[in-house]
Amino acid sequence: MSEGKKTKLITAGRDKKWTNGVVNPPVQRASTVVFNTVAEKNQAAINRANKTLFYGRRGTNTHFAFQDAMVEIEGGAGCALYPCGTAAISNAILSFVEAGDHILMVDTCYEPTRDFCNVIMKKMGVETTYYDPMIGENIRDLIQPNTKILFLESPGSITMEVQDVPTMARIAHEHDIIVMLDNTWGAGVNFSPFEHGVDISIQAATKYIVGHSDVMLGTTVASEKYWDQLREQSYLMGQCVSPDDAYLGLRGIRTLDVRLRQHAENSLKVAQWLASRPEVDHVRHPALETCPGHEFFERDFTGGNGLFSFVLKTSYPKATTALLDGMKHFSMGYSWGGYESLILANEPRSFNSLRTVANPNFEGTLIRIHVGLEDVEDLIADLEAGFARYNALVLEKEVSLK
């Protein structure tokens, strides 16, 4: 991350009109905004879409400061806020499609994104085609006359494939297709979406932006071409967040650089250690050559974070359960991006419902981990003890089969 961007994380969203003489923009809670004169009310109505106090759902100064910060960090023309990442994804898509449209969705998308397309979009008469994340230039073969959106998620959910975003965005724009990206892994700082051809960048700010596993929050930053429509459609669909959550997102931005760098350092050490383990088939960490699309990570990203996965050589759920159940520092839980380490296992059969065209066909269990900010030696020791439990049950099974 450049020095300029590090500084921007400290200064973003701290315009004097939001801070009013203090370091952090205060939390401003409001449903009703009152006006002193008819002229003042009328002026607010005219400017209600331009960060003007008008009605609570349009936002308060706390929201405006956070929105400014996200735009300063990611680029684009404006930022819409949502109560979670899934709401940001679904509302971004809903803002631009209608019955009869077609969406190209990466096959390694976040599971709720797939569910949204398969249930809500299908019911609305919008067709979804899932594509292999490594398709690259061949995405042009899947474009239809009614294709409205190309949706990317890079790296992919669980299996971590890094996409060739600039190439795919260029091809999409040749057909006037909107390019949307789930940029949660890049956190808006390690991947600059608008410099790589993205039109709308979406994040579950729940994760690294907030960084403490205690807030649900989503953001969508749009280019100038699409900002007005995204903003107004989101408003019509009633999307808003509490000022307290916006404040916590804004505060999380201040430590985003130092947290991400430590997450990345820790996770790479753990990934390299895992790559040397005899139980591990391969590691899917974007910074390692064993991860699909590693070359695009090297070209397009400025850093990593704590989330990656690895694949075991075998699938033995009883042994995997023993590995997970005895963890001291790795907790089992959904989401990621907080300061704590997390671990979850996916048996090969579980991918049958999560993939349409890009099933990796693993023979062994895939384990996804989020490496937190603990001492990395403690985390490695925790995993080493887990492998001891795992191997004991594998050996027990082998003996019983003799």
PLM-predicted stretches and their roles:
Residues 70, 234-322, 326-327:
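Structural motif of enzymes handling amino- and sulfur-group chemistry
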Residues 118-119, 127-129, 259, 314, ...:
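PLP-dependent enzyme catalytic core of the Aspartate aminotransferase-like
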Residues 149, 178, 200, 282, ...:
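Structural preference for beta-strand elements that scaffold enzyme active sites
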Residues 287, 325-354:
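Conserved PLP cofactor-binding pocket of PLP-dependent enzymes
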Residues 9-18, 79-277, 397:
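Conserved PLP-enzyme active-site core in the AAT-like
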Residues 238, 326-335, 386-396:
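A common structural junction motif
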Residues 37-87, 113-119:
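Conserved N-terminal alpha-helix of the aminotransferase class I/II PLP-enzyme fold
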Residues 1-28:
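Short conserved active-site loop signatures built around small residues
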